Amino acid sequence: MSTPLSLQALAKKILATQHISKNHYFILKYCGLWWHGAPIMFSTNEDNQLMIKSAIFKDGLELNLALMKAVQENNYDLIELFTEWGADINSSLVTVNTEHTWNFCRELGAKILNEMDIVQIFYKIHRIKTSSNIILCHKLLSNNPLFQNIEELKIIICCFLEKISINFILNEITLNEMLARLWYSMAVRYHLTEAIQYFYQRYRHFKDWRLICGLSFNNVSDLHEIYHIKKVDMNIDEMMYLACMRDSNFLTIFYCFVLGANINRAMVTSVKNFYTNNLFFCIDLGANAFEESLELAKQKNHDILVEILSFKDFYNSNVSLLSLKTTDPEKINALLKNYRSKNIMRYKKLCPKIIRWARFII
């Protein structure tokens, strides 16, 4: 059970949730609601997670991460304040750098961290989808000795990275590189422009990684920037393969298609991965590798795909999709914003058993 807030801490918490005129900033300074020359704001995000905002963290930090930053700065007032607001005081020991601050945090209840504690802290702080949070996670956790030799943490990060079509061998890179690639991929996945630019400037040798993440996470805007503007080169059919590694990646599949990637290969890849939405999208774009796809579906015992492919004579390409030959991200987004495959509609009419398979198809 959490400790009740003191009246003073509660008053500060309420004040930090209000919009305060610049004329009254002196009140915030007096109350200690001031950080890096600007007010501290307290809020919750869409997942009901506690967030701290300030001038240099304008889109928000997870509360425990804010505590870790305050500890690194040896800011005792904020350490106490963030702890009273609900931050886990144990997380303070991740960034403590002086004996006095160590003792201060211990007096507030911080306990010596074991490996499981460190893994739990990582879970708490790393999922917040803001540029401020991702960049600060990278700064505070990179080269942090507490994180270096925890096998479970490495396994967690490896499992995430393996879901992307990585172009490196996980066992041959350091934990710091794993973490950097993790943060970078999250920035691309959630369209966090500030974080993307931060990692691009810091890790220019990761250009291919940014391209891979753009393809994997259906971020056509960033894909266009890194491929067309930054001139990162990759075989177009390899790019299409990467785009097909997640279902419903319509934006990046279309982008690769316009560049000239083989749509029949994409169709076969979709069958191989059992991605029905990608399969229908490829058919909409004119793919006709039905015989090869049907044989593959039979080999893999994908009965639903065998059934879908058996109606090949009833499917047609989508003229409205084929009429737009552009790699402009805005136009692609507009084209596919409300996309629904007409061939799926045809299949539903032809196949009375569709209800059994509805969960597989958009």
Swiss-Prot record:
Q: What are the coiled-coil residue ranges?
A: none
**Biological processes, Gene Ontology terms:** taxis
Q: InterPro entries per the record?
A: ASFV_MGF360
- What is one Pfam family matched by this protein? ASFV_360
Q: List the disulfide bonds.
A: none
What this chain does, per the entry, is described as: Plays a role in virus cell tropism, and may be required for efficient virus replication in macrophages.
Q: What family is reported?
A: Belongs to the asfivirus MGF 360 family.
The protein, known as:
Protein MGF 360-2L
